[in-house]
A protein has these predicted regions:
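Cytosolic regulatory regions of ion transport systems
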Residues: 1-650
Length: 650
């Protein structure tokens, strides 16, 4: 996305805006809010104390100057004689006394001083204690939020770090961008974790508050009514029940249906019920299901995981909705070749429904918007239908005989069932899946009698020794190996460490001679995005980074709720889906071809091309080789291993 102007999603992507007049906080409330946020940081506390000392010093100097400027209260100078009385006067002054004429007055003065010190110390201690308790309360994040147009995140999970990074990119051109995080963790914990795991947030200001996300009284402190959008994170420990309770608490505090609520949900029925009960205000993201689908499809389509992450992040081309009157009366097939710097992927109909990769003969009617991938919304410029390209010769898709495939899955979690359900839809008849899982992490009973369509599933409980892997890997000539993390059985860091160890062991077996293990395509799931660079060292073919994938979806929908049905269609088991196909199915190898010609060929196959993946560009400094939305006029020479990224049917 271009950094030259504020972020936009095109002409009315979300329909006519509903304008509400937020209650403006008073000047006193703003000053208290700024003081609360600054005093919560130890460095700012020292700064405030220094400022107060300077102010008091200036006041004292002014008072002294005024007093000495008044002759009727200033004594004339007298000669100083050194004697006991002079000594006593100086000594007593140290205790705030002096000037007593008799010893009786002096003794009484010292007794008075002692009482004053005792009482003053008690009062001072009480005041210091009260101030300390006030600072502790501020540090605990109990003060209210007065920010407007902020993104409100309720709850806490590992997805919060990549979400913040994506929101920072999305709002890089937004003045005073704010994210408020409200969870049951302490303020110190949240700020320390964010500082350690989500650095370089640019101009994005993150405000943290502590409280119960399911308690309406606590939520009143978050200024929900003036939030731009709300994100409800699914804690792995509490699950959907906590998300439902949080949504109910939000509705109790703020019945305004104009603020979209993006939630993480595991159960599809729960998600559908929430969306229906709130008339579409709640948008559900079934993170685990989408991660499982991408993992399954990545095992079938090399490079798909990289394409998905490239499409979803804010640092590059994005999806926009644009009204193009010149296309009214023309077909979707015409629209695909009508934009030089944008890739059309679907239509937003006048009734609000979306159609991703509709039939090529679909007629564009008044009020219909184009859904396109572009660098920015001002790049979605109609350049006319390319009739010369549209009539180009069609390269027939190579028809491949369906041959039974054999997959090895190492590791297991509840997500494994969704992966196999997805694989069962397109694996040829007679295909097999062998599951190898460590018995200390997975109950063998959980793997018994698994049935997924016509796939033959077997399993083995192992100890994790490399001999177990050798035994499993040499059993058959596997077409794919999928490594799943032991999510929920152990911590994320332990699960990722186990996954990376398995990847290293498998690559060692691939390189060794005489062990009966043939080199095989390796797809792995990493739970923590911080481990992705380490995981790539293991030479994995495709890496599915779970928390990044989920976070990207949540951040995208939070910034633009109109994208929700588009992503739902792309990642649903039915309908259009992302595919990475051999480029030889669309153009001859070794001959220069323009991207417009590839788009035309894909169009004639009922697909919408959005980019390509160069085999020569993968692996170098973490590069994925993915090129999304190249100019239609750009040309390159395809080689073996290159792929075309299209949206079509399985």
């Amino acid at each position: 996305m271009s950094n030259k102007q504020e972020r936009s999603y095109g002409q009315g992507a979300q329909g006519e805006p509903t304008i509400s007049t937020p209650a403006k906080p008073s000047l006193g409330a703003k000053l208290r809010y700024s003081f609360d946020n600054s005093i919560a940081k130890s460095g700012m506390f020292v700064t405030w104390m220094f400022v107060l000392m300077v102010i008091f010093s200036i006041l004292l100097v002014l008072i002294k100057s005024i007093l000495f400027a008044l002759p009727f209260i200033t004594h004339p100078e007298t000669a100083i004689e050194f004697n006991f009385e002079t000594f006593w006067g100086s000594f007593a002054t140290l205790f705030g006394k002096g000037g007593e004429a008799t010893w009786a007055e002096r003794i009484l003065g010292f007794l008075t001083w002692a009482c004053t010190v005792a009482l003053g110390g008690s009062v001072t201690g009480f005041i210091v204690g009260a101030i300390t308790r006030t600072f502790d309360r501020l540090r605990k994040g109990k003060s209210p939020i007065v920010d407007n147009n902020h993104t409100l995140i309720l709850g806490w999970s590992n997805r919060i770090y990549p979400i913040l990074k994506e929101l920072a990119i999305a709002n890089s051109n937004v003045r005073k961008a704010r994210v408020v995080i409200f969870s049951n963790h302490t303020r110190d914990y949240m700020e320390d974790e964010i500082e350690a795991r989500a650095k370089d947030l640019g101009k994005l200001k993150v405000v943290t508050r502590t409280g119960d996300v399911t308690n309406p009284e606590d939520l009143k402190r978050t200024n929900i009514a003036n939030a731009k959008s709300i994100i409800v994170l699914d804690s792995d420990e509490t699950g959907d029940a906590n998300v439902v309770s949080t949504v109910l608490a939000i509705k109790a505090v703020n019945p305004n249906t104009n603020i979209k609520i993006v939630t993480e949900i595991d159960d599809a029925n729960t998600g559908e019920a929430l969306t229906t009960a709130t008339n579409g205000q709640v948008i559900t993201v079934r993170s685990h299901e989408i991660i499982a689908r991408v993992t399954a499809q990545a095992s079938r389509r090399p490079g798909l995981a990289a394409v998905v992450l490239d499409l979803l992040d804010f640092d590059g081309d994005e999806i926009y909705f644009t009204d193009v009157p010149a296309l009214v009366g023309k077909t979707y097939a015409d629209a695909i070749l009508a934009f030089n710097e944008a890739c059309v992927i679907g239509l937003l109909n006048a009734d609000g429904t979306t159609s991703v990769n509709p039939a090529q003969d679909t007629v564009i009617t008044p009020g219909t918007k184009i859904i396109a991938i572009a660098e920015d919304d001002d790049k979605v410029v109609y350049t006319g239908v390319r009739e010369d390209i549209a009539k180009s010769k069609v390269t027939p898709l190579a028809k491949r005989d369906e041959v039974a495939e054999h997959l090895l899955i190492i590791g297991w979690s509840s997500m494994g069932r969704t992966v196999l359900n997805e694989l069962a839809q397109f694996l040829p008849k007679g295909s097999t899946v062998h599951i190898v899982a460590q018995s200390r992490y997975v109950d063998p009973a959980e793997l018994a009698n698994l049935k997924f369509g016509e796939i033959n599933v077997s399993y083995a409980s192992v100890t994790g020794d490399i001999d177990d892997l050798i035994s499993a890997a040499k059993d058959k000539n596997y077409d794919e190996i999928i490594v799943l993390g032991y999510r929920n059985a152990i911590s994320e860091s332990e699960a990722d460490a186990q996954t990376m160890l398995t990847m290293l062991q498998m690559n060692q077996l691939f390189k060794a001679d005489g062990n009966g293990v043939e080199p095989t395509r390796l797809v792995a799931e990493i739970l923590d995005s911080r481990k992705s660079e380490l995981a790539r060292v293991a030479a994995v073919d495709d890496l599915v980074v779970s928390d990044s994938l989920a976070a990207l979806l949540i951040a995208q929908i939070s910034e633009n709720p109109a994208l929700a049905p588009v992503f739902e269609d792309l990642f649903d088991a039915e309908g259009a889906t992302l595919n990475v196909r051999k480029i030889s199915d669309y153009a001859p190898i070794g001959k220069s071809v323009s991207f417009a010609e590839l788009v035309a060929t894909a169009r004639n196959h009922g697909e919408s091309a959005i980019g390509y993946r160069l085999a020569s560009g993968t692996g170098a400094e973490g590069s994925t080789g993915v090129v999304l939305n190249p100019a239609k006029t750009s040309e390159f020479i395809p080689v073996e291993g290159d792929s075309l990224v299209v949206i079509g049917n399985l």
